[in-house]
Amino acid sequence: LMKHASGLFRFKENYIYVSEADMMRLHKVFTQEKPMNAYQLLQTALSGEYEGAPVRLTAEVKELINELTSDKEIALPEGLNAALRPYQQRGYSWMYRNSRIGFGSIIADDMGLGKTLQVIAILLKLKEENVINTRKEALVVVPTGLLTNWQEEIARFAPSITTHIHHGTARDLKRFDADVMLTTYGVCRSDSDLLKKHKWAVMVIDEAQNIKNHETAQTKAVKSIPAEIRIAMSGTPVENRLSEFWSIMDYTNKGYLGSIKNFNQEYAAPIQVFNDEQVVHKFRKIISPFMMRRMKSDKSIISDLPDKVEQNQYALLTKQQAALYEKTMLAAMEVIEGFGEETDSQKLFQRQGLILQMILALKQICNHP
């Protein structure tokens, strides 16, 4: 057909024009060795295209897509000691629907919009439905500084949920007897062999940018812990590059975006290097059911939030600090200026290193109590 059609061929009672590029794409589809997996089929359904060609969906697939993109409100758990704002209700309902279908969620609201409350509401709902029970509990992984905050927030908004902090040198998994275990990324890495033997109904990670580097031992440890439902919380799901988002999505919905190599080829490079708007549009479509992000600057989200007020407060250095600051700066500048206008790459690298060392030393002097 590719050799003889010359762009126009007869199909049933109609003539169809197909460009050479279209034919090459079709040939690639029909000659590929591996059939599409379930995630690739879902991406095709969500984007409405395959290899640039529009697709038609069956009634069953349309029903699944409608369920994924539904905005139907889910009843709040009875024991919740809080009234959710409309946008929080939407976030809670969205995470609940995803969890019941079998997908993970990335809640990426701006800081201050109540991500923790929305997730606590989910945990309570799942406990009331007996998804979280004495045989399968919930694991919440947070930075060390947030352990107590999480425990207090759960006690405040969902007092019927019992918690246990798994942290410190005396920690013992055998002593765990609660609905929710609270632990840290560091402990997750140290105790991953024990934690992944436990049956978890839900696993939540707060400040999910802690697993943005997919190659670190910490990220691998977190992802190795099995859970039926996964939720990631982050106000900054992408800080520098799209591979960070891939790593978080690989935690919530493993395999959905393919391997990191394929992801870089199909999405990261076209978006970051070539700013391909078509790829950006497709990428947004395929991730939208699994990530929700609302901004404080969006007045349609929260109209009664007051404008941010900044107040600058200046602290003076003590005489001892000021003298040490000046002495350190002069000594460092003398060494740095000794390099002159050197253009040798190695010398430039050394000079840059000395500048960074000086800045760090000056910051330490300013922070001295």
Predicted regions: what they are:
Residues 1-63, 245:
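Charged, low-complexity intrinsically disordered regions
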Residues 54-275, 284-305, 309-311, 316-369:
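ASCE P-loop NTPase motor core, strongest for the SF2 helicase catalytic module
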Residues 280:
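Long, charge-dense, solvent-exposed interaction surfaces that engage phosphate-rich ligands
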